[in-house]
């Protein structure tokens, strides 16, 4: 570790976005944190009445805290002990609402990573929120470096000029290190259509 392996890249760790995340420890942790029963108020996740705003805020705050404590923090600490950086990105980090249900809010995770990262997909300009959240946290906690898994979904016909345009948008908003998506050993089977382009010998 450390030479030549510099870090560990995590790709889209997330909670169950198809429903509400659950853990056997969640009810006790909720009551300890907020002083009232999770069980008695679960229905407020689906009904807009009473103290539903407060309950939802506290529910998602706790879910995010538990995800950070049981995944991001242990991985980050392991990386530090082994001379590595924790980098990569989480799922749905480009939307403020989506990131709550996918990881409990992204910025707390970024603060625990030695090299926060994003996933910049597509041949397009995205919302500046994606880059600015990572850059903001990195400047406060991690020295200002931000990694981007970039150029995925830009298509087989993407030009170097277009790639420069995509990268320019990211770097103007605080991203400092590209991680090209992707370099496959072969294009056989489904890989040919796996979010092109590739950055390997197959691409002229």
Where are these regions (language model features)?
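Hydrophobic targeting/anchoring helices
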Residues: 70, 74-77, 82-204
């Amino acid at each position: 570790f450390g030479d030549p392996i510099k870090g560990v890249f995590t790709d889209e760790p997330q909670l169950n976005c198809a429903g509400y995340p659950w853990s056997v420890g969640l009810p006790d942790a909720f009551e300890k944190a907020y002083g009232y029963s999770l069980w008695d108020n679960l229905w407020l996740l689906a009904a807009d009445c009473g103290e539903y705003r407060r309950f939802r805020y506290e529910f998602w705050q706790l879910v995010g805290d538990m995800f950070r404590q049981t995944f991001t923090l242990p991985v980050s600490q392991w990386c530090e002990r082994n001379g590595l950086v924790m980098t990569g990105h989480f799922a749905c980090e480009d939307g403020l609402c989506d990131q709550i249900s996918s990881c409990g809010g992204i910025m707390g995770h970024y603060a625990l990573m030695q090299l926060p990262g994003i996933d910049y997909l597509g041949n397009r300009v995205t919302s500046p929120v994606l880059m600015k959240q990572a850059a903001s946290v990195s400047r406060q906690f991690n020295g200002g470096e931000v990694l981007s898994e970039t150029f995925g979904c830009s298509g087989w016909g993407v030009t170097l000029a277009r790639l420069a345009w995509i990268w320019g948008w990211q770097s103007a908003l605080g991203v400092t290190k590209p991680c090209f998506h992707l370099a496959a050993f072969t294009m056989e089977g489904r890989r040919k259509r796996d979010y092109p382009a590739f950055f390997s010998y197959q691409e002229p």
